[in-house]
């Protein structure tokens, strides 16, 4: 499970680069039950709250040619050290380590297969507050064309532990990842081997996908459709996991809705 007790390599933030920030807020607000506030000193950025706790952010998409996408951030005590580890492991630095005064230190990267991710050292007011509950991040998932290579990279950078488990129906293997030295209940994501043809949502490039917890996957999926998004897969039940739907927002950013099995 994802918690707010951040340890090295655990998810601690996520944000969306959107071509139209107000339109994105108008979509995600009803779908996930979020409310939005502009933090002081920012230009066009909105913080999302779920039941009074910070659930992430939405900011302007400024990179020419880039697609709208969610970016996961993983905790690090030292963004500079992690940036060096990324380079040694074959990744690239997209955004050099920098400080956001009063909030956090961060850096953004691309792994060797092209998936984008970031790291964060939160300040006292930084990081996610809404996790594993309605409207909160409850899982992170990487679709990779070389799952073994991806795991080797992230284990080098973060020291993640991993465990393979059969996919439902015996169709392939799903790899669960957990921060270094943490028990199995601190698992925070998975890596799935896919072919290039299965990466249409991310224009053929491996990518990370956020999974948001919702009280009713079916009702949330209806809200996605009502507000101009697309339900690509589902809702469908994954035995032992919950009810899930893969969706895209009106700008094409993909995400997953899940009502966990209790």
Language-model features: locations:
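Short acidic, gly/pro-rich beta-turn/loop elements at beta-sheet edges
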Residues: 24-26, 58, 82-84, 150, ...
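Short amphipathic beta-strand/extended segments with alternating polar/hydrophobic composition
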Residues: 56-59, 185-192
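Vicinal oxygen chelate
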Residues: 1-7, 11-19, 46-47, 61-85, 91-138, 142, 163-184, ...
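Core segments of cupin and vicinal oxygen chelate
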Residues: 2-53, 88, 96-104, 142-186, ...
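Short, low-complexity, polar/charged sequence segments that are solvent-exposed and flexible
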Residues: 33-35, 56, 76-77, 93, ...
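Carbohydrate-binding/catalytic loop surfaces
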Residues: 196
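Active-site-adjacent scaffolding segments
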Residues: 40-132
């Amino acid at each position: 499970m994802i918690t707010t007790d951040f340890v090295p390599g655990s998810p601690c933030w996520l944000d969306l680069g959107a071509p139209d920030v107000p339109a994105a807020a108008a979509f995600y607000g009803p779908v996930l039950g979020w409310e939005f506030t502009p933090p002081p000193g920012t230009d066009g950025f909105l913080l999302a709250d779920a039941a009074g706790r910070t659930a992430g952010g939405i900011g302007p998409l400024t990179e020419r040619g880039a697609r709208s996408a969610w970016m996961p951030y993983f905790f690090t005590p030292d963004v500079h050290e992690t940036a060096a580890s990324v380079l040694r492991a074959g990744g690239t630095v997209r955004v050099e380590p920098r400080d956001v005064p009063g909030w956090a230190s961060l850096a953004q990267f691309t792994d060797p297969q092209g998936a984008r991710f970031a790291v964060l050292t939160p300040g006292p007011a930084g990081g996610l507050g809404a996790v594993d509950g309605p409207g909160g991040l409850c899982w992170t998932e990487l679709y990779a064309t070389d799952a073994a290579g991806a795991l080797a990279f992230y284990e080098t950078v973060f020291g993640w532990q991993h465990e393979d488990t059969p996919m439902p129906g015996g169709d392939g293997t799903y790899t669960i990842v957990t921060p270094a030295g943490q028990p199995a209940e601190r698992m925070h994501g998975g890596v799935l081997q896919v072919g290039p043809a299965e990466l249409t949502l991310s224009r053929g490039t491996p990518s990370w996908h956020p999974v948001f917890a919702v009280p009713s996957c079916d009702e949330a999926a209806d809200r996605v459709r009502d507000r101009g998004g697309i339900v690509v897969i589902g809702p469908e039940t994954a035995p032992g996991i919950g009810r899930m739907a893969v969706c895209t927002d009106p700008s094409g950013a993909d995400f997953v809705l899940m009502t966990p099995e209790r």
